[in-house]
Amino acid sequence: MKRQEFALFSLTLMLSPWRRVLLPAVLAAMAGPALAQLKAPSQASRATGIFVPQSSDVAVPSSQPQLGVPQPSSGGKRSQLVDEVVAVVNNSVITRRELLDRADEIEAQLRTANRPAPPRADLLGEVLERLIMERVQTQAAQDAGIKVTDQELDRAIESVAQQNRLSATELRRRVEASGMTWTKYRDELRKQVQVIRLREREVDSKVQVYDGEIDNYLAARGGQGAAATGPTEFNVSQILVRVPENASDAQKQELQKKAEQLLKQAQGGADFAQLAQANSQGPEAAQGGAIGFREIGRLPALFANAVVDLQPGAVAPEVVESANGFHILKLTAKRVAPASTSASSPAAASRITQTQVRHILIRTGPNMPEAEARRQLGTLRDRITHGGDFADAAKRFSQDGSAQAGGELGWVSPGELVPEFEQAMNRLRPGEISEPVVTQFGVHLIQVENRRETEMAPEKQRDFARAEIREQKLRAAYDDWVRQLRSQAYVEYRVNRQR
């Protein structure tokens, strides 16, 4: 399920507001119990919800709509608008109406969240790129022949309804009231599941974590099972021949030839740093292409695979292609980092403080501004501190998957929860209830029930490290995969990206 959480995190960057809440429910239906909503990405134990954090950049607010159903459409007001094509993506088109409707949705979210919107032209450019990326991935999944059965789709829709405390009939009524047909809703959902399946096949299945990486991770943090020294670090230098986003096939071939020529020069004994300074378009060109010492797990996956078996001073035998262009790589140096000072006391390092905690969550979004969620939870806190029952309140009001368990998250270890939640939790004594706490999931009331000191078994330490390293690699591999899909797609802009 951890892989699915990662997929959702990444896909939310390209989906319209209602789709961002719909997707977690899709995967609940596909995979059964999911990750705790508040669990940090590297954790995968309790099943208390699958709402996905909003990863925000310039355009999209960090909050989510309150319901996993479409919000009222603004498309009707454009009924007289000529539906011209603004972009061609392989064999499909994106229309001006799609672009403006999506931009309006995002602006409405920003207004609700009291966040300033970027200039309209900038917003339209960003939204158009997102629509293109969404279309590219959907087409790739369809071209790969990935199928989603009607039965799987029905389970996904049932999960959407349950998460939003609706019956299937009520969900359909909400969808149709928003202006979207039920058939369209099912089609959109099917496409997103196809994309997730493709990513699992093309990205997740190829990411591996090696025992040496786990040893290095534990050594750096002083855990049991770690080596006596610190992790091995690699100093990689690169020459980047950048390929423009809209480069033609002929341009790309010319740039590849240039990269091959630079590789031959580097392999022939030319000074790599001077070659980089003169030819690289990477951000570290002025430093001779040196990226600096990093653990292997913190290098881009393409780089790590190319240099992991090289001896210091060696140049990778082949040009490495990424979505950014062509890379010539050299392993400049390799070293063993000093061991962590805490590594000398593995017994102490393996003892951790666990917290038994429960919470009440109100998700924020267009239907629930953050200020209103704070007000409601403040009122609820007053009731509980004056004799009300926390578990009963969680069952009635919480919008997390843990609601039916009275908000219980059970015993949690350091690093298992998102930072804002964990920091607030750590300030509480057993029995205390926090003031409303804001995270990317919404607003919470947190109650600490108990604390205990416990040993973390070496096997659990290694499992934790493996999950964390895998998460880092998945993110890097996913980014590379998406850029690669984009670079291989035929994209033609038909109009200026302005209203």
Swiss-Prot record:
InterPro entries: OMP_Chaperone_SurA, PPIase_dom_sf, PPIase_PpiC, PPIase_PpiC_CS, PPIase_SurA, SurA_N, Trigger_fact/SurA_dom_sf. Disulfide bonds: none annotated. PANTHER family: CHAPERONE SURA (PTHR47637:SF1). Chaperone involved in the correct folding and assembly of outer membrane proteins. Recognizes specific patterns of aromatic residues and the orientation of their side chains, which are found more frequently in integral outer membrane proteins. May act in both early periplasmic and late outer membrane-associated steps of protein maturation. The lineage of its organism: Bacteria, Pseudomonadati, Pseudomonadota, Betaproteobacteria, Burkholderiales. Residues 231-333, 352-450 form the PpiC domain. Keywords: Chaperone, Isomerase, Periplasm, Repeat, Rotamase, Signal. HAMAP family: Chaperone_SurA. It is found in: Periplasm. The keyword rRNA processing does not apply. One of its GO terms (molecular function) is peptide binding. It catalyses: [protein]-peptidylproline (omega=180) = [protein]-peptidylproline (omega=0). It holds the Pfam family Rotamase. Transmembrane segments: none annotated. Residues 1-36 form the signal peptide. The PPIase activity resides only in the second parvulin domain. The N-terminal region and the C-terminal tail are necessary and sufficient for the chaperone activity of SurA. The PPIase activity is dispensable for SurA to function as a chaperone. The N-terminal region and the C-terminal tail are also required for porin recognition. This is Chaperone SurA. One of its GO terms (biological process) is Gram-negative-bacterium-type cell outer membrane assembly. GO terms for cellular component: outer membrane-bounded periplasmic space. Its EC number is 5.2.1.8.
